Curated annotation (Swiss-Prot):
It is an enzyme of class 2 (transferase). It comes from the Eukaryota. This is Serine/threonine-protein kinase chk-1. It comes from Caenorhabditis elegans. GO terms for molecular function: ATP binding; histone H3T11 kinase activity; protein serine kinase activity.
Length: 503
């Protein structure tokens, strides 16, 4: 990659001055897509200064494609100018003849879908905790005249202290200019989360489509499943919800009455009756005191009723530079994760690109912690060669496509979902063959990916052991699984502080 230029763009004043790429170092790839990749980078003079770099290939691309990258940058820069704890911050942009580079805040806690257990979801206290942050972030975005149009768990990132951040503005647009709202007409988004008016190709108001998507995210958090494939007349489950005839079926029977009443106001096909952000924040379920959330970090933080929280932020971005048309769940990046380490966040691109070398042990550290947070992994008592064969066989028996990529790595696919399976020998357990099997989503819906993982895991249950967690713990890593504790709170292992969600 050559040194980036600062050729004239609509955002020329905000683009960083020319800097050689050697001033920062790529630690690892966070995600890959059809048009580029997302990289975790650090300042080579100060490796504690980190950011996510979205590297987008523009070679032989149309003017519209490049204009949409600039639009994504400008919209996210617009909301970053003031900044909000629940929205990923844009740091800057550079470009050369082959690539555009977007530099974004780095979040070290994974994607929200990592926390959603298939067919189970998560506890109501944590669902409310994350939902409140999502609503606060959406309110801020809408107040700045921007609509996101692709709200889903894969685009909601977390910090190590469970601060939720809205990311990926690749489908965002301005819905209001100088106080005058306009109707939108582009059909875009991810089908299971998209509002019916958007699926139908009608003109639509901006904010209500984000409200609808937030409701689908809440359903996924509470139940671990999506209510339908598409909000259209062709969907029996969708029509059952609209006609109020399917409440004794899944997923609705898993949801308590108070939450269901709120969802009725959010997930309604009547846009003029769909709840506003303010109405959601006043709803009894939103305001209900479920208890407190324990986090693995420093000082206690308070949640205030209907107010923006003042929580220290940290991100990663996703490879979706193009303005995508309506599609099935698409490829998104996976976060590198670090526990017990808080990266500094550069305030502008020059602060990041000041930069010697990061120790390769740092890369290994990120790789291991990435496994810990995802929880889509297990340890087996067979050697690596036989493990490889067993994983391939289990995947094939589940009806998945299996393709060898390189040594001890498999690409497993089913419909629109694909996952990469990597095997690691646990060499520090003497005289015992132990292999860590790690699954990473590379494309498609996160909840369906987890179901695929569970299917393969269940087919290999007779070889699975618990040594993997002990191995990671001995290396200084501990899986961070939220748990319900006394009084209805949520506990995270080795918690030293809490976030009070009293309202």
């Amino acid at each position: 990659m050559s040194a980036a230029s600062t050729t004239s763009t609509p955002a020329a004043a905000a683009v960083a001055p020319q800097q050689p790429e050697s001033l920062y170092r790529v630690v690892q790839t966070l995600g890959e897509g059809a048009f580029g990749e997302v990289l975790l980078i650090v300042n080579t003079k100060n490796p504690e200064v980190a950011a996510a770099m979205k590297k987008i290939n523009i070679a032989n691309k149309s003017k519209d494609f490049i204009d949409n990258i600039r639009k994504e940058y400008l919209l996210q820069k617009r909301v970053s100018a003031v900044g909000h704890d629940n929205v990923i911050r844009m740091i800057g942009m550079r470009n050369d003849p082959q690539f555009y580079y977007l530099f974004l805040e780095y979040a070290d806690g994974g994607e929200l879908f990592d926390k959603i257990e298939p067919d189970c979801g998560m506890s109501p206290v944590f669902a409310q905790f994350y939902f409140k942050q999502l609503i606060c972030g959406l309110k801020f975005i809408h107040d700045n005249d921007v609509v996101h149009r692709d709200i889903k768990p894969e685009n909601l990132l977390l910090t190590g202290t469970h601060v939720l951040k809205i990311s990926d503005f690749g489908m965002a647009t301005l819905y209001r200019n100088k106080g005058e709202e306009r109707l939108l007409d582009l059909s875009c988004g991810t089908i299971p989360y998209a509002a019916p008016e958007l699926c139908a190709g009608k003109k639509y108001r901006g904010p209500p489509v984000d409200v609808w998507s937030s409701g689908i995210v809440l359903i996924a958090m509470l139940t671990g499943e999506l209510p339908w494939d598409r909000a259209s007349d062709a969907s029996q489950s969708y029509m059952g919800w609209i006609s109020n005839t399917s409440l004794d079926e899944r997923p609705w029977k898993k949801i308590d009455v108070r939450a269901l009443c709120m969802l009725r106001k959010i997930v309604t096909d009547k846009t003029d009756k769909r709840a506003t952000i303010e109405q959601i924040q006043a709803d009894p379920w939103y305001q209900h005191n479920f208890g407190q959330v324990e986090t693995p970090n420093g000082r206690p933080l308070k949640r205030a009723r209907n107010n923006d929280e003042n929580i220290t932020c940290t991100q990663q971005a996703e490879c979706s530079a193009k303005r995508r048309h309506l599609e099935t769940p698409n490829e998104k990046s996976t976060l590198a994760e670090r526990q017990n380490a808080s990266f500094s966040q550069p305030t502008k691109t020059e602060d990041l690109l000041l930069t010697q070398h990061i120790d390769m042990s740092q890369t290994n550290s990120n790789l291991l912690q990435r496994m810990v947070c995802r929880m889509t992994r297990f340890c087996v008592v067979t050697d690596i060669r036989s493990t490889y064969q067993k994983v391939a066989r289990a995947s094939e028996h589940a009806g998945f496509g299996v393709r060898e990529t390189d040594d001890y790595r498999l690409l497993v696919t089913w419909r629109e979902v694909s996952m990469m399976v990597s095997l690691y020998t646990m060499g520090d357990i003497p005289d015992k063959p132990r292999v860590m099997v790690d699954f990473r989503r590379s494309r498609g819906d996160g909840i369906q990916f987890k179901k695929m993982f569970m299917d393969v895991r269940n087919r290999m249950h007779e070889w699975i052991c618990t040594d993997g967690n002990n191995w990671l713990a001995n290396l200084g890593y501990v899986p961070r699984n939220p748990q319900i504790v006394n009084g209805g709170g949520v506990n995270v292992e080795h918690s030293a502080s809490s976030i009070n969600v009293d309202v």
